[in-house]
């Protein structure tokens, strides 16, 4: 047996009962009785009429079975290794004292600064070596092809 739901009240409509209302835009509405049809045509909001299914759902009426609230699962933080550091290394760093950590940090900074200075010194030495023996002047491609050399103006 096929049943339909009332579009206004949400109640069940059994075969041979109710009315079918077709709007101008071809949307079909099914009403269980004249009461729900009348309220629909008056453009009443079913969420504000106490006996409709929509109102009862919105105001949590008649749901006595769900007394116990649903418990949500608590999220638990899990430590995972990341690229470049295993879990043991991470745990070791976490357990270090702040003083030891700052000392290790300063040592690492000092080491990186020394390395940087070293590379800069090497660059400077390379530059000085290149400046000591200059290469021949760079000639333009046009000149090499035999283009006439532009003579500087002497009248001024």
UniProtKB/Swiss-Prot annotation:
CC annotations in GO: cytosolic large ribosomal subunit
Top-rank taxon, per record: Eukaryota
Xref: CDD domains: Ribosomal_L24e_L24
Record's compositionally biased regions (Low complexity): 130-156
UniProt feature, compositional bias: Basic and acidic residues: 110-129
Region of interest called Disordered, as start-end residue ranges on this chain: 110-156
InterPro entries per UniProt: L24e/L24_sf, Ribosomal_eL24, Ribosomal_eL24-rel_N, Ribosomal_eL24_CS
Keywords associated with the record: Cytoplasm, Ribonucleoprotein, Ribosomal protein
Classification via Gene3D superfamilies: 6.10.250.1270, Ribosomal protein L24e
Gene Ontology terms for molecular function: mRNA binding; structural constituent of ribosome
One of the protein's GO biological processes: cytoplasmic translation
Pfam families, per the entry: Ribosomal_L24e (PF01246)
Subcellular location: Cytoplasm
Coiled coil region boundaries: none
Major site of localization recorded for this protein: cytoplasm
Family, similarity comment: Belongs to the eukaryotic ribosomal protein eL24 family.
Role of this protein: Component of the ribosome, a large ribonucleoprotein complex responsible for the synthesis of proteins in the cell. The small ribosomal subunit (SSU) binds messenger RNAs (mRNAs) and translates the encoded message by selecting cognate aminoacyl-transfer RNA (tRNA) molecules. The large subunit (LSU) contains the ribosomal catalytic site termed the peptidyl transferase center (PTC), which catalyzes the formation of peptide bonds, thereby polymerizing the amino acids delivered by tRNAs into a polypeptide chain.
Quaternary assembly: Component of the large ribosomal subunit (LSU). Mature N.crassa ribosomes consist of a small (40S) and a large (60S) subunit. The 40S small subunit contains 1 molecule of ribosomal RNA (18S rRNA) and at least 32 different proteins. The large 60S subunit contains 3 rRNA molecules (26S, 5.8S and 5S rRNA) and at least 42 different proteins.
PANTHER family: 60S RIBOSOMAL PROTEIN L24 (PTHR10792), RIBOSOMAL PROTEIN L24 (PTHR10792:SF1)
Protein name (database record): Large ribosomal subunit protein eL24
Lineage: Eukaryota, Fungi, Dikarya, Ascomycota, Pezizomycotina
